[in-house]
Amino acid sequence: MFRLLKRACSFLLLFVIYQSFVIHHNVQRVLAYKPMVEKTLAENDTKANVDLVLAMIYTETKGGEADVMQSSESSSGQKNSITDSQASIEHGVNLLSHNLALAEEAGVDSWTAVQAYNFGTAYIDYIAKHGSQNTVDLATTYSKTVVAPSLGNTSGQTYFYYHPLALISGGKLYKNGGNIYYSREVHFNLYLIELMSLF
């Protein structure tokens, strides 16, 4: 029994070390875009900041794809139509800046603007009519009743989403319904990048 427990602890320790290495590698890859993000923000009148944009890049692609902010769909309606990181960041920052301005105008919290990056700008009006504060419950309802049906999921079909923040809340997402945990993941990744930047 003791040998089995020792083996399990060793495996867990190796897994944690490996995951820490992977996360650190991904953070460093994202941080390589910092000068590009700073330049783009300097050229725009925006309430977005460098750390927020970098956290969104980490959430979207971990810096591992040319379309680092997954801007293609909001830009052209097609996946992977943007093949240049600078263009991806420029479009992503423009969309985020637009969302932040709309959120301020509507009197909702800034995390609603971040969630709207995933759900679409109409989510800002939805939150304005439902308490002015983005929550997982509101995001879940919006995903199920608005986003998913608009993309063909009218039956409420779900799938399991393996992310720690999702697992805490049950771990399910609606097929074609966006990511109800998106703003929370970005928020979490802000701290993750800050922590990993120390090493």
From Swiss-Prot:
Chief location:
other
Q: What InterPro entries does this protein map onto?
A: CwlT-like_lysozyme, Lysozyme-like_dom_sf
| Name the record gives this protein | Pneumococcal vaccine antigen A homolog
* Subcellular localization(s) per the UniProt record: Cell surface
Name which cysteines form disulfide bonds. Answer: none
GO CC term, one of those recorded: cell surface
